[in-house]
Curated annotation (Swiss-Prot):
Subunit structure: Interacts with ribosomal protein uL14 (rplN).
GO molecular function term, any single one: ribosomal large subunit binding
Family note: Belongs to the Iojap/RsfS family.
PANTHER family linked to this entry: IOJAP SUPERFAMILY ORTHOLOG, MITOCHONDRIAL ASSEMBLY OF RIBOSOMAL LARGE SUBUNIT PROTEIN 1
Keywords: Cytoplasm, Repressor, Translation regulation
Subcellular location: Cytoplasm
Name listed for the protein in its UniProt record: Ribosomal silencing factor RsfS
Length: 133
């Protein structure tokens, strides 16, 4: 009997950095606000990267999440798991190697995930999307 594959990893050869670029480009195309990328490799087994972004409204957050899931599936064949769409205050997409959090601005400020995952080291601070380009 074959060993079960990791549920987190996608089954394609899509590189995590290429997936990260796809995610940040998609969010930028959809006019997401304050896109932040947090490298998790070596710090957490949940993913290689966490991406956090805001939308101006629940409607924009919903649209960004759905478009992003469609783009990831088209590029990699991976079906992202999505949580939080009914209210769309905070939507989480699990894209395998990347976890994406999409917020309305006031909800993002309340939870402050960037600070929680900052780990207190200058080198561990989130990288803004403009630095990645």
């Amino acid at each position: 009997m074959p060993a079960p594959s990791s549920p987190r990893k996608n089954q394609t050869s899509f590189d995590p950095e290429m997936l990260l670029k796809l995610v940040t480009d998609s969010l930028d195309d959809d006019q997401a606000l304050e896109i932040a990328t947090i490298p998790l490799a070596g710090k957490s087994s949940i993913a290689d990267y966490m991406v956090i972004a805001s939308g101006r409204s629940s409607r924009q957050v919903t649209a960004m999440a759905q478009k992003l899931a469609d783009r990831i599936k088209a590029a990699t064949g991976y079906v992202s798991k999505i949580e939080g769409l009914p209210a769309a205050d905070w939507v989480l997409l699990d894209a395998g190697d990347i976890i994406i959090h999409l917020f309305r601005p006031e909800v993002r400020s309340f939870y402050n995930l960037e600070r929680m995952w900052g780990f207190g080291d200058e080198s561990d601070q989130p990288v803004s999307q403009s630095v990645l380009s």
